[in-house]
């Protein structure tokens, strides 16, 4: 049976709730963890069929985990379960290789619907995400500006908005201070901002803090 699940989320209560729901529906939860590095380790060792993954996790963010899982070539599907705004993250997750995206603000039973669809070979994303990809958007809105950021740049922006220093960000992402400074410079350029205050305002305006 293709029903082995790995849960990666840094909220223990939510992990427990998802585990109970999935086991009730016949899925076998073979592992769970609160960070990206351990998540990758478990995925390599136990090779789940489905990874239920949050984006804002410590040590290695969810988008990076998706990319690394893809590079490993493991026969698994990734379902993102996150509180991050779908307007900014759903398309990015799809492009990174995720098969589904569910917002934590939805009824948690939506996770089961998504898991079943994903394991049946379908993708499961908000309808607006797919329609936006078909139509495109030429307006220079915040979301358009943010959409051109790399996954790493987006993570740095979020951490800056949370008040973290360059050193804290460097430690969190396993980067040098110089590399973080380079990312900050790129963010200022790409987001048409003139100061760190403007960057943080933009991030908070778009629920990235």
From Swiss-Prot:
Keywords: Activator, DNA-binding, Phosphoprotein, Transcription, Transcription regulation, Two-component regulatory system, Virulence
Gene3D superfamilies registered for this protein in UniProt: 3.40.50.2300
Modification type 4-aspartylphosphate: residues: 54
Chain residues forming the annotated DNA-binding region: 166-185
Domain HTH luxR-type: 142-207
Stretches assigned to the Response regulatory domain: 4-119
UniProt PTM comment: Phosphorylated by BvgS.
Coiled coil (residue ranges): none
Keyword DNA-binding applies: yes
Gene Ontology BP terms: phosphorelay signal transduction system; regulation of DNA-templated transcription
Entries under InterPro entries matching the protein: CheY-like_superfamily, Sig_transdc_resp-reg_receiver, Tscrpt_reg_LuxR_C, WalR-like
SUPFAM superfamilies listed in its UniProt record: CheY-like
Pfam families listed in its UniProt record: GerE, Response_reg
GO molecular function, one term: DNA binding
Transmembrane segments: none
Role: Member of the two-component regulatory system BvgS/BvgA. Activates the transcription of virulence genes.
Subunit structure: Homodimer.
Protein name in UniProt: Virulence factors putative positive transcription regulator BvgA
Source organism per UniProt: Bordetella pertussis (strain Tohama I / ATCC BAA-589 / NCTC 13251)
Gene name tied to this protein: bvgA
């Amino acid at each position: 049976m293709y029903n082995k699940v790995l849960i990666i989320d840094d909220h223990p209560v939510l992990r427990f709730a998802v585990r109970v729901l999935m086991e009730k529906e016949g899925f076998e939860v073979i592992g769970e963890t609160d960070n990206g590095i351990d998540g990758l380790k478990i995925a390599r060792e136990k090779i789940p069929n489905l990874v239920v993954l949050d984006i804002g996790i410590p040590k290695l963010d969810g988008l990076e985990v998706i990319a690394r899982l893809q590079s490993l070539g493991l026969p698994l599907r990734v379902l993102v379960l996150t509180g991050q705004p779908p307007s900014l993250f759903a398309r990015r997750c799809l492009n990174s290789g995720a098969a589904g995206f569910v917002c934590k603000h939805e009824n948690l039973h939506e996770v089961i619907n998504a898991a079943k669809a994903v394991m049946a070979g379908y993708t499961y994303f908000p309808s607006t995400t797919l329609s936006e990809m078909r139509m495109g958007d030429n307006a220079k809105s915040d979301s358009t500006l943010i959409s051109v950021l790399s996954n790493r740049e987006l993570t740095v922006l979020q951490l800056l908005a949370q008040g973290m220093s360059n050193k804290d960000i460097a430690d969190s992402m396993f980067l040098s201070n110089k590399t973080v400074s380079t990312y900050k410079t790129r963010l200022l350029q790409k987001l048409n901002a003139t100061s760190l205050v403007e960057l943080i305002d933009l991030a908070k305006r778009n629920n990235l803090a």
